[in-house]
Each structure stands twice: as structure tokens, then as C-alpha cells.
Amino acid sequence: MASVHEKLISTVADCAPEQPRNKVTVVGVGQVGMACAFSILSGNYADELALVDVLEDKLEGEMMDLLHGSVFLKTRKIVANKDYSVTANSRIVVVTAGARQQEGESRLNLVQRNVNIFKHIIPQIVKYSPNCVIIVVSNPVDILTYITWKLSGLPKHRVIGSGCNLDSARFRYMMAEKLGIHASSFHGWILGEHGDSSVPVWSGANVAGVCLKSLNPNVGTDKDQENWKDVHKQVVDSAYKIIELKGYTNWAIGLSVADIIESLVKNLGRVHPVSTMVKNMYGINEEVFLSLPCVLNNCGVASVINVTLADDEVAKLRKSAETLWNIQKDLKDV
């Protein structure tokens, strides 16, 4: 007797299932990982989404929760497993897993613990998806992007740190709020190391091509009577404030990662301030990753925009590079 399926559906052609073209994997299903996953699904940037974590129950629960929203999504396949074989043939892999800093722990010790975690994660990613682009989100992101590059053996253009893409978005939002315009209409960049020592590029900050420096030569400096410099301090402090209020940050970084992924999968050639190898740029001689304006397309970082920076901005970039290198040079097993 024919089944309901056989009575309902008549096969016209036996088509072999093809490999996904835009498969995205998210490693780590914590608050940040799931915000990335949700933003990727909402933007319809993947034809398959894979989730990986060591916590099997949470992993299965998150997958089920997303699958139950399938009617509202355009990503047909969502899979999850602690085994990295589930990530096979990924075009992009987003790494959000990592150790959190413990009270009183040195930055070097935190990074070394993350090296040990990444030594398990990164080779597995490359084993199953040797042609992927890796986006590192885990903090400290610039050092962990360097570690990922070293452990993966991938060319530098295919290892990207989320870097200052979010810092710049926060900067644009806060500056636009003060000016009474939409965030997308203020053009400004934060470069260098993600976080406390990031570098606001006041020399290029503009609205409709009108540089703020041309209106106030002291903008962003200690001599500025309008104290625009305080906006960058708010950008740096904002993550701490959110963590104080809700315990973690996740939505904005999730949206930021999805923004980067859109440029990659759609081959857009958009410019993003993301973490990339900066050796031999701006007088930096060490192998460190910092955020510079990068053109992103389907191969990863296609090129870097050579921004003309003020002398003090270059000095701050070099200082960031020196700080990172002083930690990296003492790492073991990289």
C-alpha cells in the first residue's frame, strides 16, 4: 500500500544533492555564537548553517530552537554536532569559542590557555574545510587571529579577525547621535587593536565629505573645547557598561559578524575595519594582526586601503603592534 508521501509527491527527476555553496559554521554556541548564528540566518547569508560546541545538550537545544523557526527562515539546513565532520565544506567558519579571563589572570596566561583550546579547534576546521575563510571573534581577537593564522597554515587573506568592525559601528552611532543624523551618514573609522587601545581616525572623520577637522582643527585632541574625544572613550567603555548591565555583549557583535559575512559571500568588495596581517605597513615590522580598512570579497581580504594617517595615529598603531608582539613572542606551541 502506497504511503502518504508516495501518494502526495510524484518524483520527476532523481537529482543528486549538490554541495552547499554558502555553508557557514559557527564554533561555540554561547551568547556571542548564537547571536552570530541568528544574524546570519536573519540576513539569509547561508544555505547551510553548522553549529559546533563541546556542550552536547546545549548544542542540540540551540539547533532545535532554530529549526522550529524554519518557516520564518530561508536557510533550509541547520546541523549541529560536537564532531567537526559536521562542518565539512564550509565556505566560512566563525570562531567564537575560547577561555574567559579569570580574576587576576594575566593577559599572557589567558592567551596561552586559548592557544591550547585553538590547537584543538583550528586543525579540525582546516581538515574538513581546507578552502574556507576563518573569521575569529573570540577575544583578545587580534592575538587569537594571529594564533589561528599560525595554526591553520592558511594564507593570510583567508584569516580575518572581527577586529574594529564593531568599534567603528559604535563610533559612527555615537557620533551620529551627537550630530542628529543617521549612523550610516557619519563616516569614521576606528583602527588598530580591538578594545582599549583602539585608534580613532579623527583625521578622516566626515559627514557628506566635510571633514570635522576642517571645521575644528583640534577635534579629538586634548585641546578640543567641545571634547569630541570623549566619544571614543564612550566607545571603549561601552562593552564594559553593557556587561555591567546584562552580563555579556552579543547582539551588536552578532550583527557585525553577519555584516562581514555578507561582503564575503556576496563578493561585494566593501571596505571593513577588520583585523589583518599588518607587517611592513605603517612601519610595523612584526607579524601582528590589527584592524585596517580591508576590501572584502569572496576570497577574503582582497586588499588593504592605504589610509593617510596623522603622525599621532601612526604612533598609536605602532604602540598597539608593540604591545601585541610582546605577548605573542612569549607564547608556546604556536
From Swiss-Prot:
<comment type="function">
    <text>Interconverts simultaneously and stereospecifically pyruvate and lactate with concomitant interconversion of NADH and NAD(+).</text>
</comment>
<dbReference type="InterPro" id="IPR011304">
    <property type="entry name" value="L-lactate_DH"/>
</dbReference>
<feature type="binding site">
    <location>
        <position position="100"/>
    </location>
    <ligand>
        <name>NAD(+)</name>
    </ligand>
</feature>
<comment type="subunit">
    <text>Homotetramer.</text>
</comment>
<dbReference type="GO" id="GO:0005737">
    <property type="term" value="C:cytoplasm"/>
</dbReference>
<dbReference type="InterPro" id="IPR018177">
    <property type="entry name" value="L-lactate_DH_AS"/>
</dbReference>
<feature type="active site" description="Proton acceptor">
    <location>
        <position position="194"/>
    </location>
</feature>
<feature type="binding site">
    <location>
        <position position="107"/>
    </location>
    <ligand>
        <name>substrate</name>
    </ligand>
</feature>
<dbReference type="InterPro" id="IPR015955">
    <property type="entry name" value="Lactate_DH/Glyco_Ohase_4_C"/>
</dbReference>
<feature type="binding site">
    <location>
        <position position="139"/>
    </location>
    <ligand>
        <name>NAD(+)</name>
    </ligand>
</feature>
<dbReference type="InterPro" id="IPR022383">
    <property type="entry name" value="Lactate/malate_DH_C"/>
</dbReference>
<protein>
    <recommendedName>
        <fullName>L-lactate dehydrogenase B chain</fullName>
        <ecNumber>1.1.1.27</ecNumber>
    </recommendedName>
</protein>
<dbReference type="InterPro" id="IPR001557">
    <property type="entry name" value="L-lactate/malate_DH"/>
</dbReference>
<keyword id="KW-0520">NAD</keyword>
<feature type="binding site">
    <location>
        <position position="170"/>
    </location>
    <ligand>
        <name>substrate</name>
    </ligand>
</feature>
<comment type="pathway">
    <text>Fermentation; pyruvate fermentation to lactate; (S)-lactate from pyruvate: step 1/1.</text>
</comment>
<feature type="binding site">
    <location>
        <begin position="30"/>
        <end position="58"/>
    </location>
    <ligand>
        <name>NAD(+)</name>
    </ligand>
</feature>
<keyword id="KW-0560">Oxidoreductase</keyword>
<feature type="binding site">
    <location>
        <position position="249"/>
    </location>
    <ligand>
        <name>substrate</name>
    </ligand>
</feature>
<feature type="binding site">
    <location>
        <position position="139"/>
    </location>
    <ligand>
        <name>substrate</name>
    </ligand>
</feature>
<dbReference type="GO" id="GO:0006089">
    <property type="term" value="P:lactate metabolic process"/>
</dbReference>
<dbReference type="Pfam" id="PF02866">
    <property type="entry name" value="Ldh_1_C"/>
</dbReference>
<dbReference type="GO" id="GO:0004459">
    <property type="term" value="F:L-lactate dehydrogenase activity"/>
</dbReference>
<dbReference type="Pfam" id="PF00056">
    <property type="entry name" value="Ldh_1_N"/>
</dbReference>
<dbReference type="InterPro" id="IPR036291">
    <property type="entry name" value="NAD(P)-bd_dom_sf"/>
</dbReference>
<comment type="similarity">
    <text>Belongs to the LDH/MDH superfamily. LDH family.</text>
</comment>
<keyword id="KW-0963">Cytoplasm</keyword>
<dbReference type="InterPro" id="IPR001236">
    <property type="entry name" value="Lactate/malate_DH_N"/>
</dbReference>
